[in-house]
């Protein structure tokens, strides 16, 4: 560590990926040793398992798994992976519940949480699309994520999972995924001011189906007169930052556009892909949200 701890290219230390609870004491010990050797100048990081892992393997339920990690390992953030888009569609029965648990536990501990999008195809996950990247990342942001990650950049050097067409693919060339991620990042950076250091006020769902962990929207957010979508529904998140509220409505489907009808009782603006605030006309407004995409609005508290 003495050779690298002052290097300008060093951001932090990666402890390990997807540990079981039995490893937490050892990881806590290693974290403390690294902090002492580093002088506390760089963050430490590891990534947790998703919620569909069997509770027998975890030796506890998922909420307790996250809670134990926070209390025992004591890292500055909570990171987890869950890739909801498979060849069979979106794994909605677990994904939203996973996000809700991680949001609640990290919020209770006063820690930010980080989430992933899948940029590398492997069994049973298809090639990424703009729709799948938007769905994963904007949904995470709606749940309060403060860090976004991609799995992975280079094509992993293993045949176990049939990894292929990573942003830097198996031939060490830029793949189509590279340019999708590049476009996604540009879009995210333009709108980052909405999400960075914002606080979640409420998270709810609208639509015909309510999945595990989803809370149906019963009361409209402040200053919202009406809000409705088609049967596929959406995630509806209210964020606050300074004197502004941000209403974030994320599609829950990759199959078709989501029709959003919304009316505000005060002046409101929509945030376009370039991050510009465009004032809305008074009265009801109708939007067609592309598959996996988001509609973002701002209005004063």
Can you annotate each of these PLM segments?
Residues 1-266, 272-301:
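Glycan-processing catalytic domains of CAZymes
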